[in-house]
Design a protein with these regions (language model features):
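Soluble catalytic domains of enzymes that build or remodel membrane lipids, polysaccharides, and related
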Residues: 141-142, 146-329
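Non-catalytic terminal accessory segments
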Residues: 1-135
């Protein structure tokens, strides 16, 4: 409830600012301004309604439409907000430092409307580009990791990582099947899934992950929870993911023998997991306790902020998700 109130308040500021500073100064008839502001209010309501539906586990075609409308609109308005705020800041600086001069009010009105048309077009195109990037076929990013003292038998060892699939009303099985195909083509020795598998219930969206069962790396596949695993039927999702062949690491480690070398894979729950289950509270002592010396130590942690644990316990590599590659929305 508190989250919903805070979210609604922040959104209200965002949409109200766009209405007051972008829409109302337009040189158009007042009735059109009110109509645009009314549309803004409707789109303001969609994300809030989407969250209410999400937490009440109402998942159907109508809820999917509301999610698409709400978050597409939010992306568009957020871009407008930042562009308009930047323009207002420049105008403020100009008013403070520039000397006053006469101007043609008709010319100013024309330039103002032209500027808003350009800004609106940029925000619209940016939103379309963002939605395209969010739903297009995923791109494999290849990274060569250099680790000092790595045994010869581990050089060339291939690991694949997926994270933050967020299957649900917007990301479906079609997308996951593409991910599965690309991973199989890599023929990786090991697969890691660093959390946030889904948004919603297992009953509605569990089917979208089924293709991941087709991936069979030689040295196994491993999963750690993200924050979204705890928002809807945590146990149900973990049971499904385990059924797909993943070893779920909850404050535990696995020693994997590769030729004559040993890889230690340690997995910890999301940093917020302890708020939902005492068993899912991060416990590094438990996670690394009793493990034998290894040639390569890998930490799986959903949030990059857990790097403090990687440093403290001498891990060679940390794999995380959560940030969506720096995507702000």
């Amino acid at each position: 409830m508190i989250f919903l109130l805070i979210f609604s308040a922040v959104l209200f500021v965002l949409y109200a600012y766009v209405g007051l500073r972008f829409v109302m100064p337009m040189d158009i008839q007042l009735g059109y301004k009110y109509l645009i502001c009314f549309a803004l209010f409707i789109f303001y309501c969609f994300p809030i309604l989407g969250i209410i539906l999400y937490f009440n586990k109402i998942e159907n075609n109508l809820s999917t439409l509301i999610h698409w409308l709400g978050y597409t609109g939010l992306g568009f308005v957020s871009l407008l907000f930042f562009i308009q705020a930047g323009a207002d800041l420049l105008l403020l600086l100009k008013s403070l430092f520039a000397k006053g001069h006469s101007f043609d009010p008709h010319r100013r009105a024309f330039l103002g409307l032209s500027a808003k048309t350009i800004v609106g077009s940029i925000a619209g195109l940016g939103s379309i580009w963002g939605m395209y990037n969010a739903t297009k076929e995923p791109v494999i990013k290849r990274v060569e990791i250099k680790i000092d003292g790595l045994p010869e038998s581990l050089k060339g060892f291939r690991m694949a990582q997926i994270t933050d699939l967020h299957v649900g009303s917007m990301i479906t099985g079609k997308f996951v099947k593409t991910v599965t195909r690309k991973i199989k083509e890599l023929n990786a020795d090991m697969l890691f899934f660093t959390g946030d598998a889904a948004d919603g219930s297992v009953q509605s969206y569990g089917k979208h992950l089924q293709s991941l069962a087709e991936i069979h790396p030689k040295y196994g596949k491993y999963f750690v929870t993200g924050n979204h695993e705890y928002y809807s039927d945590m146990n149900g999702w973990l049971q499904l993911i385990e059924g797909l062949g993943f070893k779920i690491l909850v404050n535990e480690s696995q020693n994997i023998i590769v030729n004559d070398a040993t890889i230690m894979i340690t997995g910890i729950p999301d940093r917020g997991g302890g708020h939902f289950s005492s068993f899912h509270k991060t416990n590094m002592e438990k996670a690394v306790g009793g493990m034998n010396p290894s040639d390569l130590k890998i930490l799986l942690a959903h949030q990059p902020k857990d790097v403090e644990h990687a440093l403290k316990y001498g891990f060679d590599l940390q794999l995380s998700g959560h940030t969506h590659g720096g995507q702000y929305f």
